[in-house]
């Protein structure tokens, strides 16, 4: 087993920790009306973990011309990254329309990115440009659209800001890695880019679900407020 496969295996194990965190979150929110919605967070580390197991065994990885397309990497991204930005919108209290919009923009960013990987010449850079437009639109949602929906609750504001900045900072890194890699300008090797993506994926998803667990009082407090049992509590 080569170094990349070993890293993929370690990354998959890391995602198992993320699934466990969501399990603890679910158990801690018994009675909350948001419990079933937040259970869907398990799809983020869960699907990513399955994808990395497949990647470790070379499943779905194909060579197109001189390009290696790691199919499960992009399948993982098209499933999990819309959930990442969608749950930021959910934490902000955004409308379903806004949440759906940001998820679609994210999925289109990934799909056009896949096209840029397998295309050649001018078409490659046209598709990369289109993907970049969708990428920029995500920042518009995170920093312009969603903040207008956040309720005047210090705990909810704190959670939203944490998630928004976590995703925002990491989303800057991904296109830079792509540009540096073999699919872009060829400044970095396939091995280096693969390991970097694994690190970024783990960093993006496991701490993300932990933030929901660490700030779970946001959702528990909402339940108690609705029942009239407590008054507002200060943010952590």
Swiss-Prot record:
Q: Name one GO biological process term.
A: phototransduction
Segments traversing the membrane: 4-25, 35-56, 71-92, 96-118, 123-150, 154-181, 190-222
Its membrane topology is listed as: Multi-pass membrane protein
Keyword Cell membrane found? yes
What CDD domains would the database entry show? 7tm_SRI_SRII (cd15029)
Top-level taxon:
Archaea
Name where it's found.
Answer: Cell membrane
UniProt main location, coarse: membrane
Q: Which molecular function terms from Gene Ontology are attached?
A: monoatomic ion channel activity; photoreceptor activity
PANTHER family associated with the record: BACTERIORHODOPSIN _OPSIN, NOPA (EUROFUNG) (PTHR28286:SF2), PTHR28286
What is this protein called in UniProt? Bacterial rhodopsin CSR3
């Amino acid at each position: 087993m080569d170094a990349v496969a070993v890293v993929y295996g370690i990354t998959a194990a890391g995602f198992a920790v993320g699934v466990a965190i969501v399990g603890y979150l679910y158990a801690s929110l018994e009675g909350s009306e948001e419990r079933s919605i937040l259970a869907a967070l398990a799809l983020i580390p869960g699907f990513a973990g399955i994808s990395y197991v497949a990647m470790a065994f070379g499943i779905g990885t194909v060579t197109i011309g001189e390009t290696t397309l790691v199919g499960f990497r992009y399948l993982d991204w098209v499933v999990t990254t819309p959930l990442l930005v969608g749950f930021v919108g959910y934490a902000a209290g955004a409308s379903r329309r806004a949440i759906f919009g940001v998820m679609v923009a994210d999925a289109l960013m990934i799909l056009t990115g896949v096209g840029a990987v397998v295309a050649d010449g001018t078409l490659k850079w046209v598709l990369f440009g289109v993907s970049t437009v969708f990428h920029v639109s995500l920042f518009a949602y995170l920093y312009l659209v969603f903040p207008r929906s956040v309720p005047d609750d210090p705990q909810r504001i704190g959670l939203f800001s944490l998630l928004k900045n976590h995703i925002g900072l990491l989303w800057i890194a991904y296109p830079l890695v792509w540009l540096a890699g073999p699919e872009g300008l060829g400044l970095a090797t396939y091995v280096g880019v693969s390991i970097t993506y694994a690190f970024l994926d783990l960093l993006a998803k496991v701490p993300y679900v932990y933030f929901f667990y660490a700030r779970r009082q946001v959702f528990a407090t909402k339940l108690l407020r609705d029942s009239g049992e407590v008054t507002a509590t200060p943010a952590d």
